[in-house]
Amino acid sequence: VEQKKIDTRRRRYMNRQVYNPFLPLNEYIPDGEPHVWGDRVYHYGSHDKEGGYTFCMQDYVVYSAPVKDLTNWRFEGITYRASQDPAYPELKYMYAPDVVRGNDGRYYLYYCMGGDYGYGGYTGPISVAVCDTPAGKYEYLGHVQYKDGTVMKKYICFDPAAMNDDGTIRIFYGTQYGYEE
């Protein structure tokens, strides 16, 4: 009986649509990470599909606006698709990304993927893609690694936040239980 109540609440929750006041009504970007580069604000985040059966599905999109006019948002397009990650081509869910400008002037997209219907089924390390512009087409670069070059896989990490701290790129992330490599 308790499980039935939980399932009913979950279905009711997943059937509600929440709207963002500055995006078109069919667009949803949770886990937002706004960044100012040049004279524009760029809004990164997960991407929910209108009427989708779950969340964080298949791609990332970016919107931007002039710093001095946050009522004038522009759709920059799809910047990265799940299918571009060669390590996990079968995974469809892309969670809470972040972008940082590197010391070389390029932009680095940090993200994690999963395959368990958007309910925290994280299955791999944090990945990174790179682009020459904040809202261009990002290309897969690899996985986050330790200084010795080994992929950071001791823990299942998710929702990376990245920053450039006076030339040192720092990544903060959530984690679940560890697993053996």
Short names for language-model regions:
Residues 2-181:
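Carbohydrate-active catalytic/glycan-binding domains of CAZyme proteins
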